Amino acid sequence: MSSTGFTSPFGNANPFGSSGRSESGPMHRLVEEDENDTITSPTTPHFGVKNNAAPAFWNGFGGDAPSDMPVRRQPDDFPAHYNLGRRTSVSAESLKPVTDNSDNWSPPVHPKTAEQLERLKKAISGNFLFNHLEDDQSAQVLGALVEKPVPAKGIKVITQGDAGDYFYVVEKGRFEVYVNSTGALQPGPDGMGQKVGEIAEGGSFGELALMYNAPRAATVVSAEPQCTLWALDRVTFRRILMESTFSRRRMYESFLEEVPILKTLTPYERSKIADALESQKYPAGHEIILEGDPGHSFFLLEAGEAAAFKRGNDSPVKNYKKGDFFGELALLNDAPRAASVISQTEVKVARLGKNAFQRLLGPIESILRRTRYVEAEEVDPLQVS
């Protein structure tokens, strides 16, 4: 195999040792792998450079050799007829979210200098996958990521059709994305297929294969030398993000139960809203919505305090606390925002987009209208939207 391939930490040896017994752990592994397969570990210093002396059309990073390649025997390999005639099966890691302390799993931590940590924070700051994470979960992601220099142009980082093992964030450089209509990398100079895009600094790739247990959907190749990637392994990726999604949904369901306007909804309807909400934080003094702007979102105040202001009026016309909502009238009436809402303290809001608002809050539209008009009569003529 060319030196561009990933080096397995076990080489060609039986990863369970001479006894042939697997060690217990939080995940199950596929043991019927081809002995020729080599998979990259993000803990290796860097991606290798292609050895032109060996065929490389399927030998990208994370790539698998064809299943009909001859098998090189090693003294400590499995017996020659191991599993011959037996049905093989594939089992994946168990990633069921847990609510107790019986799960001893903890994410790996790879030490980083202050400079590396700062660069990494910048690299993932704009990535949508991490926007909803709590501070402690973001810290887990930062700790688990491993720096992966890519020294040369034309190095395959992931290969279409392969199993996905790592998720990557681009800190430096550019990467080209190719898709072959056959669904996998093919032999020959045009085997990667058609170029469909590029990924630049701050971008990411490889998440789909990890999220959905699907083969890689594209081949990603370095477009210039001296690139830098950060790699997150499959289990850590799924555990942190899936646990985050599960915890976030439970938190929102509990929160929505406390919102008076939503008490008439069924638990199922509230759960659908919980799935659609996006959490955002704002510092004190931030304009969450601006008077006169078109309305695109509905907001629930999770924490902190905010106030509504009309132009020409220095005093707030309405104050908001945890559990209050605003921004609904612009969506109900398809009208511009009637007031500005400004955070008075650091706040955390749950945002619901216009389409989701109209789809999910239809059952209480009349209540939303009635409640707001009652409040407008009792408090002020503001129709905050």
Swiss-Prot record:
GO molecular function annotations of the record: cAMP binding; cAMP-dependent protein kinase inhibitor activity; protein kinase A catalytic subunit binding
Record's keyword annotation contains RNA-binding: no
Binding residues annotated for 3',5'-cyclic AMP 2, in chain numbering: 261-378
CDD domains, per the entry: CAP_ED
Gene3D superfamilies: Jelly Rolls
SUPFAM superfamilies: cAMP-binding domain-like
InterPro entries per record: cAMP-dep_PK_reg_su-like, cAMP_dep_PK_reg_su, cNMP-bd_CS, cNMP-bd_dom, cNMP-bd_dom_sf, RmlC-like_jellyroll
Keyword Manganese belongs to the record: no
Phosphoserine PTM sites in chain numbering: 89
This protein's UniProt keywords: cAMP, cAMP-binding, Nucleotide-binding, Phosphoprotein, Repeat
Family per record: Belongs to the cAMP-dependent kinase regulatory chain family.
Subunit structure: Tetramer, composed of 2 regulatory (R) and 2 catalytic (C) subunits. In the presence of cAMP it dissociates into 2 active monomeric C subunits and an R dimer.
Protein name: cAMP-dependent protein kinase regulatory subunit
Organism name: Neurospora crassa (strain ATCC 24698 / 74-OR23-1A / CBS 708.71 / DSM 1257 / FGSC 987)
